Amino acid sequence: MKIFAILGASASGKSALGLRLAKELECFILSLDSLSIYQEINIASAKPSKEELLSIRHFGIDLLTPNEPSNAALFAHLFEEALEASNQAGKKALLLVGGTGFFLKRIIEGLSPAPTLDPSAKEWLKEVLENRREAFKELEKIDPLYTSRITPSDLHRLRRGWEIYLGSGLSPSLFFETHPPKPLGHDLKIYELTLERELLRQRITERTEQMLESGLIDEVCQLESRYTREPQAMKSIGIAETLAYLDGEISKEELTPLISTHTAQLAKRQTTFNKTQFTSIRHLEAPRLFEEICHTITKS
């Protein structure tokens, strides 16, 4: 089975291209998006529509509530799940589509397997993490090297450190040393969907306007009411600026250009990351990218 990763900046059209390819190749899609994995964050994430999700099986969408943590390990697990489902269904290809190249990098490099916790340990840890500063101090006594690389507010890594210690009896640093990551054992072709800069900026602005017309402000109000502003997802582009508007820090007229500017800055960082991290990546416009992937499947 062939595995293709299609990366691209926000608003580049990668999701639409991925859907078109998935329909053509009759394959599944693993979404590599840090927001689409959350339920209820529909407008801010610009996730595929309900109809599109029904037409093509997706992995990595609507799995978590906004107050649950997401991390690279979860996407590595989702990749294995999508790969197994594709093999069982006799698919010829699997598409990985999204803007978060960091998740793809972790899938390729592999992750150290995290030990499992029994229910009582999970409950104990949940209570401990209610006071992150104290949880950090206690973990610091166990592994000062590990905690020197994180902060008390880094809930994802703080939780992972405790899970490793409780599940294995080893300090996180020693666990990582004795349980090295297992690299991806599958052939993977990586593409980046390219667009002329001014066209991308125009699309970003248009998408931002569409998000606001579709009810972004109401969505953010509901999310804040249910989950507060504490979860990491609530600090994402689109949500953070809307909260600033609700606080009276910016006007409604300033909201669209501010979200657009931050999205464009993110797009630039995404492109830079992809160029530096994936040496074999191919940069193609949509028609050529579509044609090349289809040709690869046809000749196999």
UniProtKB/Swiss-Prot annotation:
Keyword annotations: ATP-binding, Magnesium, Nucleotide-binding, Transferase, tRNA processing
Gene3D superfamilies per the UniProt record, alphabetical: 1.10.20.140, P-loop containing nucleotide triphosphate hydrolases
Location of the region described as Interaction with substrate tRNA in the Swiss-Prot/TrEMBL record: 33-36
Gene Ontology biological process terms in this record: tRNA modification
SUPFAM superfamilies in UniProt: P-loop containing nucleoside triphosphate hydrolases
Binding site residues for substrate: S10, A11, S12, G13, K14, S15
Domain of life: Bacteria
Name this polypeptide is given: tRNA dimethylallyltransferase
The organism of origin for this protein: Wolinella succinogenes (strain ATCC 29543 / DSM 1740 / CCUG 13145 / JCM 31913 / LMG 7466 / NCTC 11488 / FDC 602W) (Vibrio succinogenes)
